[in-house]
UniProtKB/Swiss-Prot annotation:
Protein name: 3-isopropylmalate dehydratase large subunit
Keywords of the record: 4Fe-4S, Amino-acid biosynthesis, Branched-chain amino acid biosynthesis, Iron, Iron-sulfur, Leucine biosynthesis, Lyase, Metal-binding
Gene3D superfamilies: Aconitase, domain 3
Pathway(s) it belongs to: Amino-acid biosynthesis; L-leucine biosynthesis; L-leucine from 3-methyl-2-oxobutanoate: step 2/4
Assembly and interaction partners: Heterodimer of LeuC and LeuD.
Organism, scientific name: Lactococcus lactis subsp. cremoris (strain SK11)
Functional summary from the UniProt entry: Catalyzes the isomerization between 2-isopropylmalate and 3-isopropylmalate, via the formation of 2-isopropylmaleate.
GO molecular function: 3-isopropylmalate dehydratase activity; 4 iron, 4 sulfur cluster binding; metal ion binding
Required cofactor(s): [4Fe-4S] cluster
Protein family according to the UniProt entry: Belongs to the aconitase/IPM isomerase family. LeuC type 1 subfamily.
Catalytic class of the enzyme: lyase
Domain of life: Bacteria
Length: 458
């Protein structure tokens, strides 16, 4: 019997039609939708007189456009229209969805796992690239376009060409103060933002096994910034423990686990490419430029331009120079949130550093839990008080300042330490300057007023 990767096992069992090397029709186990990429898809169904084929396998939430100060006071007309249209569509087509302001509302890539809908062995799609987050559970999960959203709504299938297989081994035990966010930023900095193009990435190694499910989701989330189609990990006891007891966990849980345990890569499975990264000596990462690959370990000097026009443009946009270091960046804003790092564990790590301290003069800091359940859990632990006492604003749970699509935008020309996943030009607002880092690094920077080595604090 031919040895297979977890990706091969899951892909092959979901093929409805087609041969490998050609477009294949895949069955989809979970389709998650939000207000930005679904309106045209629903209108397409309406125009064609079609219904949603599997409403029970579809799930929606509002996240991108929702304000975080007063979630019901939506001033932007386009945002309001998208939210109102989404609410109308899910009601008309009978799709289960979190109510605006409801107990389960949050970022789409967080509420699916938190509700127990994300499970090993599933194929999961959403009209959003960071759907790869769900791959941490041993699922095939990837983002799709709006026309594909319509196709999945109508047929519960999607045409795809099977990607190649890449294995990435994270080896070693990280130093205290180094987190999974640093793992993935280091990987992208070393190999580039296009190294994963055309691949389904499997993350493995003892450094992955040691991570919590929340930390694993951070890595799979940023598979897209690595250029990959998707990222996934083999399920284990941590995976099963996370899913167990959640609202949509399987009723016959032990039976489900016995099946999930078979959904792992065979030891002699063959990959098209294998990369390794030793994290034992890794330092905290900070990006300096305008893509996630422009990152360095703390203390390293920003690189020379060397006729690289992308670097030259990045330096101009960020108002930085070769030879400077992260500690030279004049920070004005701190954002702790996003589908990359707004889970309970992320905010707990940041709160440990913030507790008993105060945000530096001249800085604005906001903390935005990624979902209502996380916000409630944070407040039960008193984390909200820690942040507010330190001078942070404690906001309502949605996408927030990850992207300039809602009121939480970073002012022009202001440098922001951000726990999000993208630092493109204008990503957080017109002419905003984004520096990606871990929640712990962002918290330490908030206190010091500049980037510092969090290893000296934790």
């Amino acid at each position: 019997m031919t040895a297979k990767t977890i990706f091969d096992k899951l892909w092959d069992r979901h093929v409805v039609a087609g041969n490998e090397g050609e477009p294949q029709l895949l069955y989809i186990d979970l389709h998650v939708i939000h207000e930005v990429t679904s309106p045209q898809a629903f209108q397409g169904l309406r125009d064609a007189g079609r219904s949603v084929r599997r409403r029970d396998l579809t799930y929606g939430t509002l996240d991108h456009n929702v304000p975080t100060k007063d979630i019901f006071n939506i001033q932007d007309l386009i945002s309001k229209k998208q939210i109102d249209t989404f609410t109308k569509n899910v009601k008309e087509f009978g799709i289960p969805a979190e109510a605006h302001g409801g107990k389960g509302q949050g970022i789409v890539h967080m509420v699916a796992p938190e509700s127990g809908r994300t499970q090993p062995g599933k194929t999961i799609v959403c009209g959003d690239s960071h759907t790869a987050t769900n791959g941490a559970f041993g699922a095939i999960a990837f983002g799709i376009g709006t026309s594909e959203v319509e196709h999945v709504l109508a047929t519960q299938t999607i045409w795809q060409v099977k990607p190649k297989r890449m294995k990435i081994e994270f080896q070693g035990h990280p130093q205290k103060g180094v987190y999974s966010k640093d793992f993935i930023l280091a990987l992208i900095a070393k190999y580039g933002v296009d190294a994963g193009v055309g691949y389904a990435v499997e993350y493995t190694g003892n450094a992955i096994s040691d991570l919590s499910m929340e930390e694993r989701m951070t890595i799979c989330n940023m598979s897209i910034e690595f250029g990959a189609k998707m990222g996934q990990m083999n399920p284990d006891e941590k995976t099963y423990d996370y899913v167990k007891g959640r609202e949509y966990a399987p009723e016959n849980f032990d039976e489900a686990v016995s099946k999930w345990e078979k959904l792992v890569s065979d030891s002699d499975a063959v990959y098209d490419k294998v990369l390794t990264l030793d994290v034992s000596q890794l330092k905290p990462m900070v990006t300096w430029g305008t893509n996630p690959g422009m990152g360095l370990e703390f203390g390293e000097e920003f690189p020379k331009i060397n006729d690289d026009l992308n670097y030259e443009r990045a330096y101009q946009y960020m108002d930085l120079k070769p030879g400077q270091t992260a500690s030279d960046i004049d920070l004005g804003y701190i954002f702790i949130g996003s589908c990359t790092n707004a889970r309970l564990g992320d905010l707990e790590e940041a709160a440990k550093i913030i507790k008993g301290n105060h945000i530096a003069d001249g800085l604005t800091g906001i903390v935005v839990p990624g979902s209502r359940p996380v916000k409630i859990a944070d407040e039960e632990l008193g984390l909200d008080k820690i942040f507010k006492n330190a001078g942070f604003e404690w906001r309502e749970p949605v996408c927030s300042a990850c992207l300039g699509m809602n009121p939480d935008q970073i002012p022009a020309y202001v440098h922001c330490a951000s726990t999000s996943n993208r630092n493109f030009e204008g990503r957080q607002g017109h002419n905003a300057r984004t520096h990606l880092c871990s929640p712990a690094m962002a918290a330490a920077a908030a206190i010091a007023g500049k980037f510092v080595d969090v290893r000296e604090i934790v």
